[in-house]
Amino acid sequence: MLTSGIILLAGSLLSPNPGLIFWTAITFVIVLLILKKIAWGPIIGALEEREKGIQSSIDRAHSAKEESEAILRKNRELLAKADAESDKIIREGKDYADKLRADITEKAQSEAKKMIATAKDEIEQEKRRALDVLRNEVADLAVKGAEKIIKTTLDADMQKKIVDSMIQDLSTKRN
């Protein structure tokens, strides 16, 4: 019996039954219509909503990327300008420092030359004064010596005493 039941089942599945095909097709169409009415709209709506969300995210990502690239370009330009400006400022600072150093050096050299000239003039004046004083002293001594010579008669001892006296006078006046 088992064998005959299996054969019956196998025979009915393998042989096309027009009623079964009809009812299967009707059931498929009904299920398809029910799914279309109940589930197809929400599924398609959810898929479209999801697609819009994804497209919106992609668009935002593209615009953010473009915006960040624009900001990056602008920052690079600003950085290049800042570098150029800093180089210019440094160059101007160095030029100013060089000019200032040259001016200060020139002024210092000029001042040193003036000080040297002033010192030379003062030394020359002091030298002249000293020579004038020395001449006056020598003249005074010569006059005094001549006075002494004239007042007394000169012998060898007397001459020696006069010269010694003049030397003493000269040394006491210097000190």
Curated annotation (Swiss-Prot):
One of its GO terms (cellular component) is proton-transporting ATP synthase complex. GO terms for molecular function: proton-transporting ATP synthase activity, rotational mechanism; proton-transporting ATPase activity, rotational mechanism. The chain crosses the membrane at residues 20-40. It holds the Pfam family ATP-synt_B. It is found in: Cell inner membrane. The keyword Transmembrane applies. It comes from the Bacteria. SUPFAM superfamilies: F1F0 ATP synthase subunit B, membrane domain. Keywords: ATP synthesis, Cell inner membrane, Cell membrane, CF(0), Hydrogen ion transport, Ion transport, Membrane, Transmembrane, Transmembrane helix, Transport. Disulfide bonds: none annotated. Gene3D superfamilies: F1F0 ATP synthase subunit B, membrane domain. InterPro entries: ATP_synth_B-like_membr_sf, ATP_synth_b/b'su_bac/chlpt, ATP_synth_F0_bsu_bac, ATP_synthase_B_chain. It is a single-pass membrane protein. HAMAP family: ATP_synth_b_bprime. PANTHER family: ATP SYNTHASE SUBUNIT B (PTHR33445:SF1), ATP SYNTHASE SUBUNIT B', CHLOROPLASTIC (PTHR33445). F(1)F(0) ATP synthase produces ATP from ADP in the presence of a proton or sodium gradient. F-type ATPases consist of two structural domains, F(1) containing the extramembraneous catalytic core and F(0) containing the membrane proton channel, linked together by a central stalk and a peripheral stalk. During catalysis, ATP synthesis in the catalytic domain of F(1) is coupled via a rotary mechanism of the central stalk subunits to proton translocation. Component of the F(0) channel, it forms part of the peripheral stalk, linking F(1) to F(0). Belongs to the ATPase B chain family. F-type ATPases have 2 components, F(1) - the catalytic core - and F(0) - the membrane proton channel. F(1) has five subunits: alpha(3), beta(3), gamma(1), delta(1), epsilon(1). F(0) has four main subunits: a(1), b(2) and c(10-14). The alpha and beta chains form an alternating ring which encloses part of the gamma chain. F(1) is attached to F(0) by a central stalk formed by the gamma and epsilon chains, while a peripheral stalk is formed by the delta and b chains. This is ATP synthase subunit b. It comes from Pelodictyon phaeoclathratiforme (strain DSM 5477 / BU-1).
